[in-house]
UniProtKB/Swiss-Prot annotation:
It comes from Buchnera aphidicola subsp. Acyrthosiphon pisum (strain APS) (Acyrthosiphon pisum symbiotic bacterium). GO terms for molecular function: oxidoreductase activity. Keywords: Disulfide bond, Redox-active center, Signal. Pfam families: DSBA. This is Thiol:disulfide interchange protein DsbA. Involved in disulfide-bond formation. Acts by transferring its disulfide bond to other proteins. Disulfide bonds join C49-C52.
Amino acid sequence: MKKILIILCILILSCNVFSCEFKNGREYTEKHKVISNIPSIIEFFSFFCPYCYEFEKTYDTQYLIEKKIKKNINIQKYHVSFLGGKLGYVLTKSWIIAQQMGIEKKIVLPIFKGIQETYTINNLDDIKKIFKEKAGVSESKFNSFWNSLTIKILISKQEEDIRKYNLKNIPTMLINEKYVIDYSKIEEIFKDSFAEKYTKLIQFLINKKEKI
């Protein structure tokens, strides 16, 4: 009986510490009134965002989420078009095509590098070249995806979601359509053990219940 009480006390204390570790307005922000019933994560980024590039190279957030959080979660990654002018839209559409092909990991860093380091990506043909060199995608296959109705529907939905969430900063993560994580804030707060605290924060928000 004594052992059971000790275990219960430890669990209660650990839960309290965990819940107090993260605060609304500090590590995350409550964005919307209604929480989604389906656990979901949406990452927002741009190939024109230097901070997004550094974050992708250093932490590989997709890997952290998939490997560290043991739960069936709908994970999406949206490229925003409000940076980069016309090329921003072209990159958004190309990113959706890469997702549909399942080749995101092969092209994400080469595109970042081409945009921000070598300055070798300036138009759609340059993007097609990356797809071919890094993922073996022929121009005809790329074009068939580019002109497909599916891609048009997906890009319309994504742009509608971005407008709905009214995001101001990137990179940003939206959890359960309610909680927003601004990477620029948490990197400094979590600097000593970022990956561990970052995944704990995501888990905390995924499991967070609305107060009735």
